[in-house]
Amino acid sequence: MIVVYSLGGSVLAAQDSAGLKRYAEALRTIARDNQVYVVVGGGALAREYIGKARDVGASEALCDSIGILATRMNAALLAAALDGSAPFRVPESYDDAIEASKTYRMVVMGGVSPGQTTDAVAALLAEYTRATLLVIATSVNGVYTSDPEKDPGAVKIPRMGAKDLSRMMSQIELKAGSKSPVDPLAAKIIERSHIPTVVVDGRNVANLIRAIDGTHDGTEIRS
């Protein structure tokens, strides 16, 4: 299979060195039998620098560029933990990532273009590579009827259609550094390309494997 992961930067940044090694080992296990791409988010590092940039009057486009640099730093950190299982040089384009996959069974990258979140980059990469599965490993354990951090009555949706996901996510305002289970652009790409997608809690490293063997407790998205 070809599997593309969108790994939230907040998930990765919360790990100490031992935690990073656990994620690296899980990804190596998955890559034994699959071609794996991992797109890493910027997390708190990106939000901190984007916040400071806004404070000094930076445009949203410049804030996006700063966020991309943060994602690439996080990607480089994960690549270092993978210790040769993925290229140390972080690809900066989809073509670079696909070229690297000719040599490596695992490729780790960050953001690509201003205006695209990590989820959107991962969805586009899944589209480019005709991926079998897109896994969005984030800080929530699926898609809910509303924000579970704000609404105690929010209910997790175990399965949903791509069109329903796109409709739900289109109501979320998208700015540099914004957070949502799946961003609106990614949802549109998932819908148009019929990409099988799973949203899982990436804070549990075991969910990276469970997402592909069907034993996860997240949200499955199908066309």
Swiss-Prot record:
UniProt-listed Gene3D superfamilies: Acetylglutamate kinase-like
Catalytic activity: UMP + ATP = UDP + ADP
Binding site for UMP: 42, 64, 112-118
Disulfide bonding pattern of the chain: none
Any one GO molecular function term: ATP binding
Pathway where this protein functions: Pyrimidine metabolism; CTP biosynthesis via de novo pathway; UDP from UMP (UMPK route): step 1/1
Keywords: ATP-binding, Cytoplasm, Kinase, Nucleotide-binding, Pyrimidine biosynthesis, Transferase
GO cellular component, one term: cytoplasm
Location of this chain's protein in the cell: Cytoplasm
Enzyme nomenclature, EC number: 2.7.4.22
Ways its activity is controlled: Inhibited by UTP.
InterPro entries associated with the record: AceGlu_kinase-like_sf, Asp/Glu/Uridylate_kinase, Uridylate_kinase, Uridylate_kinase_arch/spir
Main location: cytoplasm
GO BP annotations, alphabetical order: 'de novo' CTP biosynthetic process; UDP biosynthetic process
Residue sites binding ATP per the record: 9-10, 43, 47, 138, 144, 147
Oligomeric and partner information: Homohexamer.
Entry similarity comment: Belongs to the UMP kinase family.
Role noted for this protein: Catalyzes the reversible phosphorylation of UMP to UDP.
PANTHER family documented for this protein: URIDYLATE KINASE (PTHR42833), URIDYLATE KINASE PUMPKIN, CHLOROPLASTIC (PTHR42833:SF4)
Name recorded for this polypeptide: Uridylate kinase
Organism: Methanothrix thermoacetophila (strain DSM 6194 / JCM 14653 / NBRC 101360 / PT)
Gene name linked to the record: pyrH
